[in-house]
Swiss-Prot record:
Locations listed in the record: Cytoplasm
InterPro entries: Acyl_CoA_acyltransferase (IPR016181), Leu/Phe-tRNA_Trfase (IPR004616), Leu/Phe-tRNA_Trfase_C (IPR042203)
EC primary class: transferase
Signal sequence extent: none
GO cellular component annotations of the record: cytoplasm
Biological process per Gene Ontology, one example term: protein catabolic process
Homology family: Belongs to the L/F-transferase family.
GO terms for MF: leucyl-tRNA--protein transferase activity
Species assigned in the record: Rhizorhabdus wittichii (strain DSM 6014 / CCUG 31198 / JCM 15750 / NBRC 105917 / EY 4224 / RW1) (Sphingomonas wittichii)
Location, primary (coarse class): cytoplasm
Disulfide bonds: none
Gene3D superfamilies: Leucyl/phenylalanyl-tRNA-protein transferase, C-terminal domain
Protein name per the record: Leucyl/phenylalanyl-tRNA--protein transferase
Length: 248
């Protein structure tokens, strides 16, 4: 099984292409550029009253980058609900390498010390490319996504790429755009087209407020110690709900 070069992987993301495998056991990886792309506009996350209530309750302890490898392994695991997966060992190793380089991040949901949900993705410029999520308890993946959106908004990101639209993501505000519109949005998020407030008919969060380097850890108050930068710590669910705005 051939390793995926991490620099090649980042270049692929920069032009809207990402890798997949046919199965967990597949030796080969193929590159995907969908004609229709799922994105979640950061200013239009659909926070239902029930989800807001769950987040406010702090039922889950939510962290960032605390257990990246475990999250990817859970997303790659074969379950009764997911008899196969597109994450083969080469893809898993490539994202672990990007994580070590600071280009891939995870959000984890914990319950009584157990990892019960989470997601991971790739960060490049002002874009975050969501790769996969999992849930071992009801609403855990929704909570993880809500915390991710709040983190991206606080950090000045412009684009959350969901790759493919699903009913689950659509219920949370994800939409589908054409390939051309997606590339325009991606160019804005990566700073190729600076100063534009919208692309492809979709507003880009924060674009009109000036151009500053996005910071995945801005939500943590700018902590510099590695052990504190990666943990959400004292941030409450109430704060996250406030960051996400009005409930629907």
């Amino acid at each position: 099984m051939k390793a995926i070069d991490p620099d090649l992987l980042l270049r692929a993301y920069s032009i809207g292409v990402f890798p997949m495998a046919d199965s967990r056991a597949a030796d080969d990886v193929y590159w995907v550029e969908p004609k229709k792309r799922g994105i979640l506009p950061l200013d239009h996350f659909r926070l239902s009253r029930s989800l807001a209530k769950t987040i406010r309750s702090d039922r889950f302890a939510v962290t960032a980058d605390r257990a990246f490898g475990e999250v990817v392994a859970e997303c790659a695991a074969v379950t009764s609900q997911r008899p196969d997966t597109w994450i083969n060992p080469a893809i898993e190793a490539a994202y672990a390498d990007l994580h070590r380089r600071g280009h891939a991040h995870s959000i984890e949901c914990w319950r009584e010390g157990r990892l019960v949900g989470g997601l991971y993705g790739v960060r490049l410029g002002g874009a975050f490319f969501g790769e996969s999520m999992f849930s071992r308890e009801s609403n855990a993946s929704k909570v993880a996504l809500a915390w991710l959106v709040a983190r991206l908004r606080a950090g000045g990101f412009r684009l959350l790429d969901c790759q493919f639209i699903t009913d689950h993501l659509q219920s949370l505000g994800a939409i589908e755009v054409s390939r051309d519109d997606y590339v325009a949005l991606l160019d804005v998020a990566l700073g190729v087209v600076a100063g534009a407030g919208a692309a492809g008919g979709v507003a880009v969060a924060g674009a009109a407020a000036g151009w500053s380097a996005p910071d995945f850890f801005a939500l943590d108050g700018g902590a510099t110690d590695p052990d504190t930068r990666t943990v959400s710590g004292p941030i409450s669910g109430c704060t996250i709900v406030q960051l996400l705005g009005q409930t629907s």
